[in-house]
């Protein structure tokens, strides 16, 4: 997991010089290829792009390099999958939407504690975070549009997305309430998770 130029903030797109990233990525692939030959390392050794999910701006250069070299890549998707679970619950409406709103309320109330361990990989403007009362009044569509990583949606809010990305502990503390709703809303949650991983990530990379 080499350190690349630019910022890899949690849950949002890459911020930096894409051309410089491409150069560094290709250089690292060359180093791995040489190391495999020189030191007998496993031939399937892969680069790990830490916090690489949702970094759509650099997927083109990564895809190009992988196709040209036959190399592999390890992309961590736990965080983006958690957010799609939350979007799926909001899409389901009813108790699912209420839980999603409750997660936001608790995350906002505990923002300092939740954000502190991730200070170097988030960039949240608190002035851009709606109040919990405002979010309580949102429709299912409003919640989804704010959170879903689609920059063509005018209401997409990267600050909300980053806060909820690091707010997974709120859902963990909910325990069975959260897990049971995931099961009850499995169809819509699975649809969102699958579309995100396959359409936005795998198809763009491979």
Regions picked out by a protein language model, each given a short descriptive name:
Residues 1-206:
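Active-site capping/gating regions of soluble enzymes
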């Amino acid at each position: 997991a080499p350190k690349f130029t630019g910022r890899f903030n949690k849950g949002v797109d890459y911020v930096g010089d894409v051309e410089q990233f491409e150069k560094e990525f290709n250089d690292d692939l060359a180093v791995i290829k040489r190391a495999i030959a020189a030191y007998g390392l496993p031939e399937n050794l892969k680069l790990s792009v830490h916090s690489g999910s949702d970094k759509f701006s650099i997927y083109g250069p990564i895809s190009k390099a992988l196709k040209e070299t036959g190399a592999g890549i390890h992309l961590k998707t736990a965080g983006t999958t958690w957010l799609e679970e939350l979007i799926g619950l909001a899409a389901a409406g009813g108790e699912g939407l209420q839980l999603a709103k409750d997660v936001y309320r608790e995350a906002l109330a505990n923002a300092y504690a939740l954000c502190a361990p991730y200070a170097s990989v988030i960039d949240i403007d608190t002035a851009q975070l709606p109040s919990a009362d405002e979010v309580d009044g949102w429709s299912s569509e409003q919640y989804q549009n704010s959170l879903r990583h689609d920059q063509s949606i005018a209401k997409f809010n990267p600050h909300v997305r980053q806060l909820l990305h690091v707010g997974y502990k709120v859902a963990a503390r909910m325990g069975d309430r959260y897990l049971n709703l995931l099961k009850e809303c499995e169809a819509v949650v699975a649809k969102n998770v699958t579309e995100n991983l396959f359409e936005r990530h795998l198809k763009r990379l491979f």
